[in-house]
């Protein structure tokens, strides 16, 4: 079983979170977003085989922990690879108002990096 844990260091306590998860991988897998207090923001699983495109999760919440974690588990895989983008959300004056993370996950050897896609964004304020 392959698993990987990521620390989303640029999303700070009090940020308003939003996320989206989708998959077109053949293997089953589980994605979880949680914090250092034990609060789980979401857990989603792809349980069926096949490569049809599936939306697995979307939602939002306020982040009140100190560290935010994302875990990926793929039982049939021996190695998880990833391509990660991390960008600031800025206002019209180039002041940082949030953070975006995009995770493109590879579960096997074809290196297409489209097996799981996870988008997590946090804004310093909501509304």
Named regions from a protein language model:
Residues 107-111:
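Short, exposed beta-strand-loop hairpins at the edges of beta-sheets
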Residues 119-126:
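Short beta-strand-to-coil "C-cap" segments at the C-terminal boundary of structured domains/repeats
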Residues 1-98, 102-104, 114, 121:
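Extracellular distal adhesion/interaction modules in secreted or cell-surface proteins
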């Amino acid at each position: 079983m392959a698993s990987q844990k990521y620390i989303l260091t640029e999303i700070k306590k009090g940020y308003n979170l939003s996320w989206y998860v989708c998959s077109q991988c053949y293997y089953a897998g589980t994605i979880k977003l949680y914090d250092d207090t034990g609060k789980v923001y979401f857990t989603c699983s792809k349980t069926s085989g096949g490569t049809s495109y599936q939306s697995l999760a979307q939602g939002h919440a306020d982040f009140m922990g100190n560290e935010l974690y994302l875990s990926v588990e793929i039982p049939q895989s021996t190695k998880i690879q990833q391509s990660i983008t991390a960008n600031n959300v800025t206002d019209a004056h180039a002041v940082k108002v949030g953070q975006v993370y995009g995770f493109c996950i590879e579960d096997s050897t074809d290196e297409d990096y489209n097996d799981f896609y996870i988008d997590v964004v946090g804004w310093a304020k909501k509304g």
